[in-house]
Amino acid sequence: MANDKNEDQKEEETKTLQEKYDELLEELDSKNKELAKINEDLEKQKEETQEYISLSQRLQADFENFKKINEKKSKDIIKFANEPLIKNILDSYEDLERALENSKTEKELRDGVELIYSKIKDVLTKEGLEEIPAKGEKFDPFKHEALMVANDENVENGYIIDELMKGYTLKGKVIKYSKVRVCKK
């Protein structure tokens, strides 16, 4: 009986061990499946990461190309910004050349030069150039440059007596100050 009991006990222990072994195998199988899923997800993440890196590199390259193209366009815009003005002045330049070549008398030359002066003035006015009024105006240091001062009984203190050189604005911005003589008493 003791043997039967021992055998029953051994059988029971074996059965319990077998059950634990089976449970552990199931748990191991489950963990292996989880690990396989994690590895699969990790591979997908690696692929996505690589795609993002590749996309980022392409975008960076595209952006660099975009910057280079815009830089070239900007340089071209600056380089050729005066083209319309030059084209307009070229007509007057050629007129001046013809006037010099074809004028027989001083009057013809003067008439030709006056016509050319008028054309150039029109071109510059269309481009936004305006003369700064000076003579008889109150001195304005933002528009005028006083080269001389003088006392003139006919002119109020601080007003311009003479304009020595004309000044100009381009679309409202002073590009050349009028050189003037100012009355100072």
Curated annotation (Swiss-Prot):
**GO annotation (BP), single:** protein folding
A Gene Ontology cellular-component term: cytoplasm
Which top-level group of life is the source organism from? Archaea
Location in the cell reads:
Cytoplasm
> Is Ubl conjugation set as a keyword in this record?
no
Gene3D superfamilies attached here?
A: 3.90.20.20, Head domain of nucleotide exchange factor GrpE
Q: Where is the signal peptide?
A: none
Q: Which UniProt keywords apply?
A: Chaperone, Cytoplasm, Stress response
Q: Which GO terms describe its molecular function?
A: adenyl-nucleotide exchange factor activity; protein homodimerization activity; protein-folding chaperone binding; unfolded protein binding
Oligomeric state and interaction partners are given as: Homodimer.
Family listed: Belongs to the GrpE family.
Main function: Participates actively in the response to hyperosmotic and heat shock by preventing the aggregation of stress-denatured proteins, in association with DnaK and GrpE. It is the nucleotide exchange factor for DnaK and may function as a thermosensor. Unfolded proteins bind initially to DnaJ; upon interaction with the DnaJ-bound protein, DnaK hydrolyzes its bound ATP, resulting in the formation of a stable complex. GrpE releases ADP from DnaK; ATP binding to DnaK triggers the release of the substrate protein, thus completing the reaction cycle.
Question: Under what name is this protein listed?
Answer: Protein GrpE
